[in-house]
Amino acid sequence: MQTASFKNGTLKIGTRGSKLALAQAYLTRRLLQEAHGLPEDAIEILPMSTAGDRIQDRPLSEVGGKGLFTEEIEQALKDGRIDIAVHSTKDMPTALPEGLHLSVFLEREDPRDAFIGRSARRFMDLPQGATVGSSSLRRQALIRRLRPDIEVVMYRGNVDTRLRKLDAGEVDGTFLACAGLRRLGLADVITDVLDPSVFPPAPGQGAIGIESRIGDERIDVLLAPLAHRETQIALACERAFLGALDGSCRTPIAGLATVEGDRLSFRGMILTPDGRQAHEVTAEGVVSDAAALGTDAANRVRAMAGPHFFDGWQ
């Protein structure tokens, strides 16, 4: 594991090359500049192509899961070619490479899912037999649970690609994260925002996570002002829930934690891909127990589902 290149005068941020990923990297750079009074040229953004960006014709669940979006970037971090990596936390596996950690989470944007409809503005108002595009197993399962009459088709690509396919009439509607659309200045395309009590989001959705090398004290000091307390606590719970269930792109898992003062509330769900079976769990407690609450919720929902719930489709 290499030492930080920032000692040579420039902090290097690694990111995917999509518009959304770059918007998140630029936000991180701006926050670092404001926190430390740094000039713009003190921080360099290095876009990288990942396997997940290159493979667009198959679901992630078939070709390696979430790690496809991070492997090349994390290798650059380990090698010292970059100092930090900026990620959408919902795309991050819970098990990270040795020597790396998600050290800071920025203040969370809206964690909810957005529906963008062509033949109806609201998801529940879609006509019977309508076609909805989504590549997320969680969203697919929730769609099938709520509207089993709707056809769900695999729908990959970046935000622009998905919206272009929608405009071309390939589907009647699609789902995207509210946070991503807002960060891209595209909130006006949203026709319906899904109630998280009915359509719960992915763990970590709406939060930007910054990955760094464990023990890199200079980077830790630089990042510390960017850490958002409530987001850090909520994600400790959500990612513990996900990790205890061995969550990946092959498992429809939802979870959202909210923080009020020193109290935390959590609601999680696991589903079968066809949406026919779903099990929900809730938890409440003090924020200092966030990770333990998430792990306990995972153990309880697994017990509810029974030992064979994940058999045959994980």
Swiss-Prot record:
GO MF entries: hydroxymethylbilane synthase activity
Catalytic activity entry: 4 porphobilinogen + H2O = hydroxymethylbilane + 4 NH4(+)
EC number: 2.5.1.61
Cofactor remark: Binds 1 dipyrromethane group covalently.
Pfam families in the record: Porphobil_deam, Porphobil_deamC
Pathway, per record: Porphyrin-containing compound metabolism; protoporphyrin-IX biosynthesis; coproporphyrinogen-III from 5-aminolevulinate: step 2/4
Family of this protein: Belongs to the HMBS family.
Assembly description: Monomer.
Miscellaneous comment as given in the Swiss-Prot or TrEMBL entry: The porphobilinogen subunits are added to the dipyrromethane group.
The protein's role, per its UniProt record: Tetrapolymerization of the monopyrrole PBG into the hydroxymethylbilane pre-uroporphyrinogen in several discrete steps.
Protein name as annotated: Porphobilinogen deaminase
Source organism of the structure: Brucella abortus (strain 2308)
Organism classification: Bacteria, Pseudomonadati, Pseudomonadota, Alphaproteobacteria, Hyphomicrobiales
